[in-house]
Curated annotation (Swiss-Prot):
InterPro entries cross-referenced by the UniProt entry: Kunitz_BPTI, Kunitz_BPTI_sf, Serpin_venom_toxin
PANTHER family associated with the record: EPPIN (PTHR46751), WAP FOUR-DISULFIDE CORE DOMAIN PROTEIN 6A (PTHR46751:SF1)
Protein name: U15-Kunitz-type theraphotoxin-Hhn1b
Family: Belongs to the venom Kunitz-type family. 03 (sub-Kunitz) subfamily.
Cysteine pairings via disulfide bonds: C37-C85, C60-C81
The organism's taxonomic lineage, starting at the top: Eukaryota, Metazoa, Ecdysozoa, Arthropoda, Chelicerata
Domain BPTI/Kunitz inhibitor: 37-85
Functional description taken from the UniProt entry: Serine protease inhibitor that inhibits trypsin at a molar ratio of 1:1.
Subcellular localization(s) per the UniProt record: Secreted
Organism listed in the record: Cyriopagopus hainanus (Chinese bird spider)
SMART domains reported in the protein's UniProt record: KU
GO annotations of cellular component type: extracellular region
Site (Reactive bond for chymotrypsin): residue numbering on this chain: L47, R48
GO MF annotations in UniProt: potassium channel regulator activity; serine-type endopeptidase inhibitor activity; toxin activity
Signal peptide, first to last residue: 1-27
């Protein structure tokens, strides 16, 4: 019983790492800095309701932020998102 639960946890963690790690790697600059504009949208851990903006790789898109956690691809206005992430 305990072994099956442990193996399920290891499998779940492995899948989570396979999904998350490549996204984080693709967001890195060659010097190791993370390009926040390449991070996926992340609504965070709380259940509050804040309309925010993130860059989806092409345009700035509105999303709901929960108020805590998430990542830095989060802007209070479309203008701030465009200024930081849109390439001329």
């Amino acid at each position: 019983m305990g072994t099956a639960r442990f193996l399920r946890a290891v499998l779940l963690l492995s899948v989570l790492l396979m999904v998350t790690f490549p996204a984080l790697l693709s967001a890195e600059h060659h010097d190791g800095r993370v390009d926040i504009c390449r991070l996926p949208s992340d609504s965070g851990d709380c259940l509050r309701f804040f309309e925010m903006w993130y860059f989806d790789g092409t345009t700035c898109t509105k999303f709901v932020y929960g108020g805590y956690g998430g990542n830095d691809n989060r802007f209070p206005t479309e203008k701030a998102c465009v200024k930081r992430c849109a390439k001329a």
